[in-house]
């Protein structure tokens, strides 16, 4: 998923949340669906939308599922306010530009598609004959599906995510050992970032399912949160540890990674280039030392500004690991108590890493 795809996905997620099961809007849509009356609903009252309205009734009443259900019995379109609090117009005739191309066949769906493309607003078309709800957003189209179908797909995606998480944990555990022994290669770092991005892209897909499921997606959401614990933070700290380019901040480098297409992500050269390394075969075998952000973040009660001071003082993880309590105490913002906490914390982190390595 590229950055543009991710942005579009975020937009559709917001729309799906508006009409997910358990919401007032979805209740109204489901009532219309059950009554088989069909409907054309525009969400938004911008000047572009109102310029397409011909006739109808100005309602300006609070939105309720019962009100929209009754108004849908009339043939014309219903115009809702952007915040979904008001029903503004009912039985309105929409007159979009007929030169706007559309692949839709039915009159209602053609109008919905053209209005969405012309105004950029969300338009909902409920088919009287096929009994389905179709959402139009700009040039995008999305058909709402039944909850059991979405749940099945979400659970399948969760299984894939669990497999990716196992692979990522193995890669991270391997990186931990290599960092302690100071034998990390660029290839090792790129591989971990690749695995992380693969996992995050499946997670983005599951987030869309959760948005569409609404109140039915609580369990899926809890499972997703558990699987993603520390993944985002670790990815950013890995970039902090290894990126050598100075023209971008770590979060901007992360965004560059997330803009890679799937095929680009599969080529580790692209990841290395984003980190600032020369894209050649020899670079993969280059031994590089982490600055220490990620492993230091595992020590409780050590804020990021203190970690930055440590990195500034000792340059890299090995320098920090080899520092005495007295040397740690000399770092800005670190007193004797915190120096002891950091020194002991690093020892515990190393012990845990060696314990985890035996499970590999």
Curated annotation (Swiss-Prot):
GO process terms (BP): DNA repair
Catalytic activity field: 2 ATP = 3',3'-c-di-AMP + 2 diphosphate
Any one GO MF annotation of this record: diadenylate cyclase activity
Known cofactor(s): Mg(2+)
InterPro entries from the UniProt entry: DisA, DisA_sf, DNA_integrity_DisA_N_sf, DNA_integrity_scan_DisA_link, DNA_integrity_scan_DisA_N, DNA_integrity_scanning_protein, RuvA_2-like
Function: Participates in a DNA-damage check-point that is active prior to asymmetric division when DNA is damaged. DisA forms globular foci that rapidly scan along the chromosomes during sporulation, searching for lesions. When a lesion is present, DisA pauses at the lesion site. This triggers a cellular response that culminates in a temporary block in sporulation initiation. Also has diadenylate cyclase activity, catalyzing the condensation of 2 ATP molecules into cyclic di-AMP (c-di-AMP). c-di-AMP acts as a signaling molecule that couples DNA integrity with progression of sporulation. The rise in c-di-AMP level generated by DisA while scanning the chromosome, operates as a positive signal that advances sporulation; upon encountering a lesion, the DisA focus arrests at the damaged site and halts c-di-AMP synthesis.
Record family assignment: Belongs to the DisA family.
Keyword Magnesium appears in the UniProt entry: yes
Assembly notes: Homooctamer.
Keyword set includes Nucleotide-binding: yes
Protein's name in the database: DNA integrity scanning protein DisA
EC number, as in UniProt: 2.7.7.85
Residue span, DAC domain: 9-147
TM region positions: none
Keywords, sorted A to Z: ATP-binding, DNA damage, DNA repair, DNA-binding, Magnesium, Nucleotide-binding, Nucleotidyltransferase, Transferase
Species per Swiss-Prot/TrEMBL record: Acetivibrio thermocellus (strain ATCC 27405 / DSM 1237 / JCM 9322 / NBRC 103400 / NCIMB 10682 / NRRL B-4536 / VPI 7372)
Superkingdom of this protein's organism: Bacteria
Residue sites binding ATP per the record: 76, 94, 107-111
